[in-house]
Regions:
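A "functional boundary" signal
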Residues: 2-210
């Protein structure tokens, strides 16, 4: 998300020194990627060891939740396998809230690999009333994400604006469910301000995140 907002900011009337600072932050993140990858793999290995020693479906379900968090945006095929394991465990436990949570994981993967139709079908099959507070926030964010990506790859300007409008409808809902001042809150607020063409405000908020 940081990269997306950064790229949007480069076309705005921003002082060169501010752009340089943001680019240095991005460059540092890229250079440190091998270190982050090694650390993440170590965390994944530790979770897999815990899974082999787990004794209950509840424990396994919780561990798979953590494992999904490590695989998302890292290995999408593994993330999908983990999400499906969560669905199977949730069904075995006959826990509808757990089932919906795991299905949202699958939707996230579908959206992440550009299978937007499949992701939307999963989202459309879930009712927000069947989710807890964190699940609703996650649910709204996946709708926002899929429409944002569909706008990015839309063939015509008309369709681009249509999908951007759909994504925008979810921004306020997401902001209202995030802790004021948190990074997630500030990043979503900056995206909203960019959409509203309040560029200076958006950049000031973005700078405060890093």
């Amino acid at each position: 998300m940081f990269l997306a907002v950064l790229l949007a900011s480069l076309s705005l009337d921003v002082h060169p020194s501010e752009i340089d600072s943001l680019l240095r932050e991005l460059d540092m993140s890229i250079r440190n990627r091998p270190q982050y990858t090694l650390k993440r793999q170590e965390q994944i290995d530790a979770l897999q060891r815990k899974l082999r020693l787990s004794h209950s479906d509840q424990e396994r379900y919780d561990l798979y939740r953590e494992l999904f968090g490590k695989y998302r945006s890292y290995r999408m095929d593994s993330a999908l396998w983990v999400a499906n394991q969560r669905v199977e465990l949730a069904k075995r436990m006959k826990n509808s809230l757990y089932i919906r949570s795991a299905e949202l994981n699958i939707a996230e993967v579908m959206i992440g690999v550009a299978m937007y139709k499949e992701g939307l079908e999963i989202l459309d099959g879930i009712k927000s009333a069947d989710l807890d507070a964190s699940g609703v926030s996650y649910y709204y964010y996946q709708y926002h994400q899929v429409y944002t990506l569909m706008a990015d790859y839309a063939f015509s300007d008309q369709m681009k604006e249509h999908y951007r409008g759909l994504a925008y409808q979810y921004k306020d809902s997401i902001i209202s469910m995030r802790r004021p001042g948190s990074q997630g809150y500030l990043l979503m607020m900056s995206e909203k301000l960019l959409y509203e063409e309040k560029y200076d405000e958006a950049i000031e908020i973005l700078k405060s995140c890093y």
